Amino acid sequence: MRIFEVKNNAIHSNRGEFLLGFRETGSHACYMIYGVLKSKEKARSVKPGPGHEEIVLAMKGDLEVTGFYSGPLKEGSALHLEGDQECFFENRGESDSVYIIAGGHSEAARH
């Protein structure tokens, strides 16, 4: 078993995200993304891609969402996206927001 440092990797990345996936686990079955959206940052794209599904959880702070779903995503709430469904996140708050994406393959998808 391994422990993965995701928060600091996300904070120090150019995009504000860290993808914990095949490179770290050796498995194509699932992945997780830890994302940090800075105060007033907007237009962060979230899109699973063909053959993938994702559940997005607003972990810290509220997010304003546009795209496939438009409206607020309150802290502690989640949404589900499939394939080419795309959303854009905006953090209208005064402090950083954090979201977690749990992703995996759709039933018929294979790598």
PLM region descriptions:
Residues 68-84:
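Short acidic-glycine-tyrosine-enriched beta hairpin
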Residues 31, 52, 67-68, 75:
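Short, solvent-exposed loop/turn positions at domain surfaces
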Residues 51-64:
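Glycine- and acidic-residue-biased ligand/ion/polar-headgroup-sensing regions
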Residues 80, 94-111:
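A short hydrophobic beta-strand segment most commonly corresponding to one strand
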Residues 84-85, 90:
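Short, surface-exposed secondary-structure boundary micro-motifs
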Residues 1-31, 44-45, 110-111:
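A short, N-terminal "cap"/entry segment at the start of jelly-roll beta-barrel domains
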Residues 33-50:
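Conserved short histidine dyad/triad with adjacent acidic residue
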